Amino acid sequence: MNERPQSLDPELLIGPVKPPGTRETRLMGIAALTGAATSKGTSSGLGNDTDFALLNALRIWSDAVLVGAETARKENYFGVRTTAQQREARRGRGQAEVPPIVVVTKSLKFDTATQLFTDTRTPPLFAVPEDVLGDTEVSEHAREIEQAGGVIVPVEGEDVSAVVAALHARGLARIVCEGGPSLNTQLIGASEVDVFHYTVSPRAVQPSELRLFGEADTPSDHAFILEAAHTTSDSMLFLRYRSVREG
């Protein structure tokens, strides 16, 4: 039996990449053997150093980091961390120095004193259906967010494909989604995921309070092919699937 490495190069896990400016959406998720997507309340409790390195590498690859509102709140999101070398490399590729966190929300109800606003090099974006911006309460939240440095991104409609289209319209071609379950489910259901990075943690976590995917409103069945599978010495399994699209 071959000895497994303690860690893996995240670039190996990312695999082939298309030229900057080419539209591609990647989904990253981790789950225990029982299907649980969190341990002690956060997904970070399931991962190892390689999983964390993959998350950071996908952020550096991306033009936008997409996350659901509840996940951003629960996991106390902050801006993407980059080194001077990474920022220079991104400039050389024609990308912004730092990709923004993009929060998908319908309420715009956020505490602007949190590190999502205070600990970031680039303003967070908030993708919100444009038809709710006329609501008095939502409009007030939008004003508070903008005063705190955030950017409101009106979306034509409430489906996730409209969110992706709105980001593409802003020149944000490379998108990585970090959850949560509702957003993951919507992206998969709408066939918006091109590459799925799925990490399996060798732990049996009970109860499964939060899973990687939630209940879908509309049935869907989309095929993926396995591009790569790698393991580390602690039995963490890193899978990379690519969507099979007809035509």
Where do the protein language model's features map onto the residues?
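Enzymes that bind and transform nitrogen-containing heteroaromatic metabolites
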Residues: 1-247
